[in-house]
Swiss-Prot record:
Gene field: fabA
Function: Necessary for the introduction of cis unsaturation into fatty acids. Catalyzes the dehydration of (3R)-3-hydroxydecanoyl-ACP to E-(2)-decenoyl-ACP and then its isomerization to Z-(3)-decenoyl-ACP. Can catalyze the dehydratase reaction for beta-hydroxyacyl-ACPs with saturated chain lengths up to 16:0, being most active on intermediate chain length.
Protein name: 3-hydroxydecanoyl-[acyl-carrier-protein] dehydratase
Active-site residues from the entry: 71
Species for this entry: Pseudoalteromonas atlantica (strain T6c / ATCC BAA-1087)
BP GO terms, sorted: unsaturated fatty acid biosynthetic process
Lineage, broadest ranks: Bacteria, Pseudomonadati, Pseudomonadota, Gammaproteobacteria, Alteromonadales
Superkingdom in the source lineage: Bacteria
A single MF term (Gene Ontology): (3R)-hydroxyacyl-[acyl-carrier-protein] dehydratase activity
Amino acid sequence: MTINQDSFTKEELLACSRGELFGPGNSQLPAPNMLMMDRIVKISEEDGEHGKGVIIAELDITPDLWFFDCHFPGDPVMPGCLGLDAMWQLVGFFLGWCGGPGKGRALGVGEVKFSGQILPTAKKVTYKIDMKRVIKRKLFMGIGDGEVSVDGRVIYQAKDLKVGLFQDTSNF
């Protein structure tokens, strides 16, 4: 099922987390609290630095977000692994949006660099994935480069984010 839409609201992302957007058994986003975005502001198969597609999403930051209470008490900061997971979530969403069948699983990342942090005083996180390759064979797989920005400043960069869609995940 291909979706002819170039942006998605929070309600639509929640529908995706329930398996309602791309059809049963296909790509899903995680439910809150692990859903790491509030909206997708752009998704395209043609754009991006490599001409293979781009997806841009945003997360509104408020001091009451769950991870600030536990990471770290007295020194609240969003865990970097959540930003990395958000980028994998977006690659999987891109594959489902392209009509790929199966359930998404992160397969790896080539390189990750952290050069900043997300504090409770921040306003907005922006995720951007530039797709490098989409393989549409027995295994539907996407490879992309990503970045995480906080209030307009790039603070994480990831190269070669890999996500695959699988018909059967029982032996994964």
